[in-house]
A protein has these predicted regions:
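Membrane-anchoring hydrophobic segments
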Residues: 1-193, 197-202, 206, 239-245, ...
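Helix-loop-helix junctions and helix-breaking kinks within/between transmembrane helices
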Residues: 86-99, 210-235
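Small-residue-enriched transmembrane helix-hairpin modules in multi-pass membrane proteins
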Residues: 24-39, 161-175, 179, 256-337
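Cytoplasmic juxtamembrane regions at transmembrane-helix boundaries
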Residues: 83-89, 199-220, 313-324
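Short, well-structured alpha-helical interface segments that form or flank functional binding sites
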Residues: 188, 224, 335-336
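Loop-centered beta-sheet repeat module
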Residues: 219-282
Length: 337
């Protein structure tokens, strides 16, 4: 069974990497090249090495019925494999990125190889921090954020997202509030959703989603909803039978491959653009961002975490005039700055 699972995952990884390379060349670069996707042709040996580095980590994937294995395969599918491939296509000088490719591959191997307890450990010791402390803390954080952004808070439509972001960027000059926003989105929201699911308490789950809603209404960050929804997804998956967990990776690869080949077979401009948009917004985001960040930080000063406002308020080391790091990097990468 273990050997069959290994072969299935290896075969799926090879298919995924090869199909993603085709999708990059035929969809991502032609349609979204103006956004920053680049395409440099290298030798067949470079392509072979890239494929090996992208596929090899899957040999260490366990596919056990635990959340960490579920998360790790998503990291591989949406971040590591596309990033390794895009480093080849997005770099004119392959020698400048090959070590980074190796680092990505080894990091994914380490992630897959971490040993976890297969059985749940029941601890009799009470939590060191009383649960009421978390409730008091989240109330303080929520009130601070709402008091800061209340005049601009709203559910922004797709057309209004960037308008709201510009408005709120002008409001918050206090690094503490920005720090609270990070805690709200990345700690309190998933904490309460996960706790509510485990305890089967819908009120706690709703509190977690309320934290995400406040973040979105304040900053228009669509990713605010990703974490609580991902918690729901992980919770539902780990409750499934073992064979459903094992088939997760091959199923995603099959879906992606069918999507690509059906799109390639349909001679329709609208379908071509729609498919390109879907691939770019799901599987292709890391393939866009990774070469950009590598290129910029190979030639420009590092931030040393000074892009975090509370750290920059102490060190003053932030090297860009644009306060939002992503915008600063992308302006430098695309030549707008």
């Amino acid at each position: 069974l273990l050997a069959n699972r290994l072969l299935l995952n290896l075969f799926s990884a090879v298919i995924y990497v090869l199909v993603f390379r085709l999708a990059y060349v035929q969809y991502l670069y032609p349609v979204w090249g103006y956004m920053g996707y680049k395409y440099f042709v290298h030798s067949r040996w470079v392509s072979l090495l890239t494929i090996i580095l992208a596929v090899f980590p899957i040999l260490f994937y366990k596919a056990r019925k635990i959340p960490s294995d579920f998360i790790s395969i998503f990291v591989y599918i949406f971040i590591v494999a596309p990033s390794i491939i895009s480093m080849e296509y997005g770099s004119a000088n392959y020698n400048s990125v090959v070590l980074i490719q190796i680092f990505y591959s080894l990091s994914m191997i380490a992630f897959f190889s971490i040993k976890y307890h297969d059985k749940v450990i029941h601890r009799t010791k009470e939590n060191a921090i009383p649960v009421n402390v978390y409730y008091v803390a989240v109330i303080i954080v929520l009130l601070t954020v709402i008091a800061t952004y209340h005049s601009n808070m709203r559910f922004a439509s797709v057309e209004e997202v960037y308008d709201l972001r510009e408005e709120t960027a002008e409001i918050n000059t206090n690094p503490i509030v920005g720090y609270f926003m990070l805690w709200l989105a990345n700690f309190f929201s998933p904490l309460f959703v996960a706790t509510g699911l485990v305890k089967k308490n819908i009120k706690i789950v709703l509190l977690g989603f309320f934290c995400a809603i406040v973040v979105y209404m304040s900053t228009a960050l669509k990713s605010a909803f990703f974490t609580p929804l991902f918690c729901l997804l992980v919770f539902s998956v780990v409750k499934k039978r073992n064979h459903e967990i094992i088939s997760l990776f091959p199923s995603i690869v099959l879906f992606f491959s069918l999507l690509y080949f059906i799109g390639a077979a349909v001679d329709n401009n609208l379908a071509f653009v729609a498919l390109s948009l879907f691939i770019m917004r799901t599987f292709g985001i890391s393939a866009l961002l990774t070469p950009g960040y590598i290129t910029v930080f190979n030639s420009m000063p590092h931030t040393y975490y000074s892009h975090v406002r509370i750290i920059n308020s102490i060190t003053g080391m932030y090297p860009f005039s644009e306060p939002v790091l992503g915008k600063a990097v992308w302006s430098a990468y695309t030549g707008e700055a």
